[in-house]
Amino acid sequence: MPALVLLGAQWGDEGKGKATDLLGGSVDYVVRYQGGNNAGHTVVVGDQKYALHLLPSGILSPGCTPVIGNGVVVDPAVLLSELSGLNERGVDTSKLLISGNAHLITPYNVTLDKVTERFLGKRKIGTTGRGIGPTYADKINRVGIRVQDLYDESILEQKVEAALEQKNQLLAKVFNRRAIEAGKVVEDMLQYAEQIKPFVADTTLILNDAIDEGKVVLFEGGQGTLLDVDHGTYPFVTSSNPTAGGACTGAGVGPTKISRVIGILKAYTTRVGAGPFPTELHDEDGEALRRIGGERGVTTGRDRRCGWFDAPIARYATRVNGLTDFFLTKLDVLTGWERIPVCVAYEIDGKRVEELPYNQTDFHHAKPIYENLPGWSEDITKAKTFSDLPKNAQAYVKALEEMSGAPISAIGVGPGRTETIEINSFL
């Protein structure tokens, strides 16, 4: 049975939660492999809507074991708050597994994230201010706090004291902030230890054994390809690797065990925060996409920037992730447009460029070259098969598939779990 990676093919917010939850009923494990509570996904089950930030979407599927891998950064307060909220709504969270090697977001990580962003002023990145970047920086600098450190108080104290020696200098001398007491941080972190302990496990061993036994394992990426720290629109990116390679390092599973890589692709394009966005709309079409699509960030609460579909971005995602399939979402949002522009290439310095430019300056100056496709007015939310879609909607999907470089195997035609057309099975 397969091990699948499911990830965002644009700038995040593509509808990964729905796709993951749809597959979650058929898989044995759903694994978050990077990011933290800077991700946000909304899952609709029946008449219930669940907004998750840290927990894998699969936690809503009774037969599935949700896993937080070693590549995730965990805010313990957010973790316990999400678990409590789900428990109150009758969701069984007892099967959750958390890697002991996952890093913890500390109070000083959050403080540094916020003061640094304010310090940058107009040059700010658009961080969520939740301590994600500073926690990953601590990890790379080898001064990070891991989940397993909660269960050795002396090691926790040593690590926090060592980290704060430098950070307090930074807070006081650069940001004019008061020093943070190491003892208070240790006390804050230890209060979560006993509640988290039942979930802590050797997740790398468990996942590899599960794959070897023929179980179905789904790796769920947060954010999106264009927010990847290596492959995204740097520096306007996240601090981890949402791309397919991150699933291997962030969960401890070798690349030869991955059998399928599915890219979630919105039928138009959105972005939250600063950074280049060639197809962004500043007119009534952009406002209509935002309103009809409900384009407001689950995590940030900020309105998303909206624009038309960008084919060079989709091809880029196919290339850097080795995508085998696309799951196209929010096709229903485009109902009602007489014509739908699709970006097929860019104009940069007077020249036509077919692919995403590797040079950030070129990408900042890229102007979209559009091809207009005919729209449709029929309601598509009740469509169950591809042939149920209006002819122009079918043609739109086929055009996107041809431009993007991988087959579109499923289509979202509404927010609900059942409002999906499956063309090719992912399993």
From Swiss-Prot:
Name the UniProt record assigns to this protein: Adenylosuccinate synthetase
GO (cellular component) term, any one: cytoplasm
Record-listed Mg(2+) binding positions: 13, 40
PANTHER family: ADENYLOSUCCINATE SYNTHETASE
MF term (GO), any: adenylosuccinate synthase activity
Recorded metabolic or biological pathway in which this protein acts: Purine metabolism; AMP biosynthesis via de novo pathway; AMP from IMP: step 1/2
One GO BP annotation of this record: IMP metabolic process
Protein source organism: Streptomyces griseus subsp. griseus (strain JCM 4626 / CBS 651.72 / NBRC 13350 / KCC S-0626 / ISP 5235)
